[in-house]
Amino acid sequence: MSNVGKPILAGLIAGLSLLGLAVAQAAAPEMTAEEKEASKQIYFERCAGCHGVLRKGATGKNLEPHWSKTEADGKKTEGGTLNLGTKRLENIIAYGTEGGMVNYDDILTKEEINMMARYIQHTPDIPPEFSLQDMKDSWNLIVPVEKRVTKQMNKINLQNVFAVTLRDAGKLALIDGDTHKIWKVLESGYAVHISRMSASGRYVYTTGRDGLTTIIDLWPEEPMTVATVRFGSDMRSVDVSKFEGYEDKYLIGGTYWPPQYSIVDGLTLEPIKVVSTRGQTVDGEYHPEPRVASIVASHIKPEWVVNVKETGQIILVDYTDLKNLKTTTIESAKFLHDGGWDYSKRYFMVAANASNKVAAVDTKTGKLAALIDTAKIPHPGRGANFVHPQFGPVWSTGHLGDDVVSLISTPSEESKYAKYKEHNWKVVQELKMPGAGNLFVKTHPKSKHFWADAPMNPEREVAESVYVFDMNDLSKAPIQLNVAKDSGLPESKAIRRAVQPEYNKAGDEVWISLWGGKTDQSAIVIYDDKTLKLKRVITDPAVVTPTGKFNVFNTMNDVY
């Protein structure tokens, strides 16, 4: 072919591609500008976390109007929301799926469900980038460090305070774990995903799905927000520097959009550095939206462990010299999500949930220790550690897409556990749950119980309950505690999802969020861990859609 012919052919191909896009766009159902804006907000609030801002999918399915992919064997498959059509999409949105997507017929109106079914047949908009200068422009230092109190000015047992996300209210409740009374409710940005504690235990860092991060100082007579900064338009994770000599010096935050991680001052949140995560996946394909999922601070090196969802890469970020930043990139599996430390706190265990695997990172050697096959769509939260009577130290994860909890044997340098070495990095037992849809598992070093929720299960009774296993006899079926009934709240149309068991500092209470509809009364239900009897129900009107709960001591020390 002549050199003249090549650009003509390229232009023809580009033109045909644009024509195909135009045809696909023309085939999308009509929407008004107002409907598009309303749908965009609903998508951000309810869908982007699993399906991605660009709708390319991760934990959830690809929701582009049209997509195609070529398998390893060369086979090409195509699909898209346009192929599914409005009616089928309405049914999926309304009634959920067996893969862990909840039903939205008790959350959205019929009109909103129809609107969303039409919206996802349109080509997604690309949000703006967010630069270091944008971060600096958003930074608000409310109380400089030198003007903060120099000692604790209240009598609260700070290590037993719970930071509770009030999801739809855009607020954070600080609850006294000793008295079970709300200490303070603060503005926090939309749908706080996690709260993390400073190494000192003085500060609570929150980060929400609108990209806003705050520092809350617990030392004044009443807790107060002392600084805020925006990392981007959507984020999930932050953590401070914890290594000796660097305690609370820096804070890292990772965003879903733009796909990047940023480093700020740990006490003021002044922006310092932004690093993009765009690049190649473990399969060698370029991805435009590799979102930053979980981030943790290493206990044995001055590093953060940064998990990049779409690329399947784990990045160890050395924070000793930010001007000459050193990172180690470890290949694992797609799509990385959440995770936690093993029993020894040497290995970080992270779910690659769309690959049905758990990756174990050795933070001492800076290498991948293992990739462990699990059941469908592992979702550990931070997981849970205990010493199994038959297999020694294990780390555990539940699953969104399967009705089991997987127990994975983990290594230990303690001589008393040497006899279990042959089991390391294997799923040694699966605990049977009444259904799929688990989000969080939890135990405590002082407890004999292992707790698991199932809030994403489509069955009301399953989703409204938690399940408690006896770790001394794991052959027994779990005890079901119907949290919704125990709360004493009136029946509601919306499923009141029992979510995220969280222990108090002493390990003798377990707090469960009862997450109802925005207009329904929600609650935090507290059980005695030893007897499994109801101990207290917090039903203050301020408790609106509670989800994540983070005990200060347990979060500081990675107790789970």
Curated annotation (Swiss-Prot):
The protein's location, in the record's own words, is: Periplasm
Enzyme class, broadest EC rank: oxidoreductase
**Residues reported to bind heme c:** 47, 50-51, 97, 101
Q: Which reaction does it catalyse?
A: nitric oxide + Fe(III)-[cytochrome c] + H2O = Fe(II)-[cytochrome c] + nitrite + 2 H(+); A + NH4(+) + H2O = hydroxylamine + AH2 + H(+)
Q: Where is the signal peptide?
A: 1-26
* Pfam families xrefs: Cytochrom_D1, Cytochrome_CBB3
User: Binding positions for heme d1?
Assistant: 193, 236-237, 256, 382, 500
Cofactor(s) demanded: heme c; heme
Name of the protein in its database record: Nitrite reductase
Per the UniProt entry, what species is this protein from, by scientific name? Stutzerimonas stutzeri
Taxonomic classification, please? Bacteria, Pseudomonadati, Pseudomonadota, Gammaproteobacteria, Pseudomonadales
Q: Which gene encodes it?
A: nirS
